[in-house]
From Swiss-Prot:
PANTHER family (alphabetical): METHIONYL-TRNA FORMYLTRANSFERASE, METHIONYL-TRNA FORMYLTRANSFERASE, MITOCHONDRIAL
Annotated protein name in UniProt: Methionyl-tRNA formyltransferase
Pfam families with a match to the protein in the record: Formyl_trans_C, Formyl_trans_N
KW Nuclease (keyword) present: no
Keywords attached to this entry: Protein biosynthesis, Transferase
Provenance organism: Wolbachia sp. subsp. Drosophila simulans (strain wRi)
Signal peptide positions (record): none
Superkingdom in the source lineage: Bacteria
SUPFAM superfamilies in UniProt: FMT C-terminal domain-like, Formyltransferase
Positions bound to (6S)-5,6,7,8-tetrahydrofolate: S109, L110, L111, P112
């Protein structure tokens, strides 16, 4: 089977790696163009780009697939199927119709729940008890195509964005191979649009004094490693935390261990990171902190 693989971030790496070891032929890899990164602003290739080059596979980095020249190039690869995993570009109808078996997508949620760009974060923020992977046929809608295969698992207490991301990436690659091995036997199941909800891209990682304690706790897990508080205009990331039901004045740092009183409970930071420093335990962090900072309100 001739496959075009379309993906960019680390989530897609497991799937590409498995395809490269399979009997199928990956004829081209489509990924986002390198972006300037770091202090030197050197172009940084996506994880998928790096693996494709190491495997001597042609890499394509179009800025859009809406142009006829790009569509003709795609057609000339003569794909039987296109596999999409967090690619980052919209696939127009002309592209969707080229492969014999269409374009199939690896989506890290139990569709139709959490269609959109940030399903893992929203799964955690909502307090969902389970999650999973949906292998779906792409159409012109937003993650609205029929489902080819779906598998779920329970979310564990200690799961955060990273652990769920890694579990879903592994499950997605395994499920993808099952679908491809039975591609002619698949019976697509139409999604129930009435059950759909959407996972918009997350851009605000701050924990606010007005947040309920459970919301703040979920933010720590959902936004790992980016959730933060601000004290005296300093940004402090909270990488791990717990919480308890006891609470006092909302938004206040209630003791020298930086326990944060919020609505409905107290957030208990366990691992934190000050801007420009390495992560450390809350105990080590407090030892190196000005005493005034642990008597303030978060901003």
């Amino acid at each position: 089977m001739r496959i075009i693989f379309m993906g960019s971030p680390g989530f897609a790496v497991n799937s590409l790696s498995l395809l490269l070891k399979s009997k199928s032929e990956v004829v081209a890899v489509y990924t986002k163009a390198p972006k300037p990164s770091g202090r030197g602003q050197k172009p940084m290739k996506s994880p998928v780009h790096v693996i494709a080059e190491e495997s001597n596979i042609e890499v394509c980095t179009p800025i859009s697939l809406k142009f006829s020249a790009e569509q003709e190039k795609f057609r000339n690869f003569k794909p039987d199927v296109a596999v999409v995993a967090a690619y980052g570009l919209i696939l127009p109808r002309e592209i969707l119709n080229i492969p014999k078996y269409g374009c199939i997508n690896i989506h890290p949620s139990l569709l139709p729940r959490w269609r959109g760009a940030a399903p893992i974060q929203h799964t955690i923020l909502a307090g969902d008890q389970e999650t999973g992977v949906s292998i779906m046929q792409l159409d012109e809608g937003l993650d609205s195509g029929p489902i080819l295969k779906q598998e779920k698992f329970l979310i564990e207490k200690n799961d955060n964005y990273k652990t769920l991301h890694d579990k879903l990436s592994k499950l997605g690659s395994d499920l993808l191979l099952k679908v491809l091995n039975e591609i002619e036997k698949q019976l697509p199941l139409k999604q129930n649009d009435n059950d759909a909800c959407y996972a918009d891209k997350v851009e605000d990682y701050k924990i606010y004094a007005s947040d309920a304690c459970e919301v703040a706790y979920r933010k720590v897990k959902a936004f790992y490693p980016k959730a933060f508080i601000k004290i005296e205009n300093k940004r402090i990331r909270i990488l791990d935390a717990d919480f308890e039901a006891l609470a006092s004045e909302q938004g206040k740092i209630v003791n020298d261990n930086m326990h944060i009183s919020l609505k409905g409970g107290t957030l208990i930071p366990k691992v934190v990171q000050m801007e420009g420093r390495n992560p450390c335990s809350i105990e080590d962090f407090i030892r190196g902190l000005k005493s005034s900072m642990v008597k303030k309100f978060i901003e």
